[in-house]
């Protein structure tokens, strides 16, 4: 595969990272937006565009495995400006440095890397606040995107941003091996997903899954153990039928209010 136009590669389960990708594209002019899930079967991705960005959420102080795997496939021209943006709920650690290192394995790293705080929403771990309680967070996102866009527009080189919390970076370093084990086994955790009887077989979960991990069997979703734990299936279920064990039954669901269901399902723009 060859990328010749200015492009943002994004991965998004709640819509937060997709909102950032849309906002960056709007500020800088029309970028192609490509869902990283659509690149899984590409053996190599040759990047000849003037600018390319990678935007993704932070999971356990790491980039999602799918982002790491696609980053390994990128063969980037020396003339291409490369930026990364990590959306996070408060503990991003050194995730952009990890992306930079991964890209450098193929010769070229990030020219700049930015962190954007977005509403925390891991419904598998805690009860997320509903979107209307995050207005200030969305306002700060707009401000940060303006600053980032100016840097990208001028093609400035800038060190990757890291967590402002020393303890966050310290814990990440101390428990790095344990975190890596958690990440490498995330795909197995989808055995805890199930659907209640109010599932209406609408297939939204099947369509929205970025790694095609869900299919309907006997009119109920089943998970095929390729899960990235992006939580799109549980967050966007219109009937609140999809659950993770029993702990999510009474929890809120979070969907970014600035991103539509169709935008989440689409693979490219």
Task: List the model feature ranges, each with a label.
Residues 167-202, 207:
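A mid-sequence, solvent-exposed acidic-amphipathic segment
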Residues 8, 136, 199-200, 224:
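Short N-terminal micro-motifs specific to bacterial/archaeal maturation
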Residues 17-20, 95, 191, 201, ...:
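Residue-level preference for nonpolar/small residues embedded in alpha-helices
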Residues 194-222, 228, 232-249:
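Iron-sulfur cluster-binding cysteine motifs and their immediate structural context
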Residues 4, 29-30, 189-191, 219:
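Generic structural motif recognizing short loop/turn segments at the entrances and edges of beta-strands
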Residues 130, 223-224:
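Short helix/strand-bridging catalytic loops that position acidic/His residues to coordinate divalent metals
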Residues 1-7, 12-20, 26-38, 42-56, ...:
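FMN-binding flavodoxin-like domain, especially the glycine-rich phosphate-binding loop
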């Amino acid at each position: 595969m060859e990328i010749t136009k200015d492009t943002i590669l994004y991965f998004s389960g709640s819509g937060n990272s997709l909102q950032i990708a849309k906002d960056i594209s709007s500020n800088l002019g029309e970028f192609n937006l490509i869902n990283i899930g659509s690149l899984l079967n590409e053996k190599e991705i040759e990047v000849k565009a003037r600018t390319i960005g990678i935007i993704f959420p932070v999971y356990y102080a790491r980039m999602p495995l799918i982002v790491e795997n696609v980053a390994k496939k990128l063969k980037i021209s020396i003339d291409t400006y490369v930026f990364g943006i990590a959306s996070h709920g408060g503990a991003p650690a050194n995730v952009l440095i990890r992306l930079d290192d991964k890209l450098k394995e193929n010769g070229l790293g990030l020219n700049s890397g930015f962190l954007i705080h977005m509403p925390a929403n891991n419904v598998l771990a805690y009860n997320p606040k509903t979107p209307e309680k995050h207005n200030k967070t969305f306002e700060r996102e707009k401000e940060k995107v303006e600053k980032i866009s100016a840097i990208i527009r001028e093609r400035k080189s800038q060190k990757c941003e890291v967590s402002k919390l020393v303890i966050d970076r310290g814990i990440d370093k101390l428990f790095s091996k344990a975190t890596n084990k958690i990440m490498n086994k995330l795909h197995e955790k989808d055995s805890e997903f199930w659907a209640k009887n109010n599932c209406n077989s609408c297939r939204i979960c099947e369509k929205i899954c970025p790694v095609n991990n869900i299919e309907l069997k006997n009119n109920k979703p089943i998970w095929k153990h390729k899960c990235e734990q992006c939580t799109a299936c549980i967050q966007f279920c219109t009937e609140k039928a999809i659950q993770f064990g029993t702990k999510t039954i009474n929890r809120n669901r979070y969907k970014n209010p600035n991103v539509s269901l169709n935008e989440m399902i689409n693979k490219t723009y």
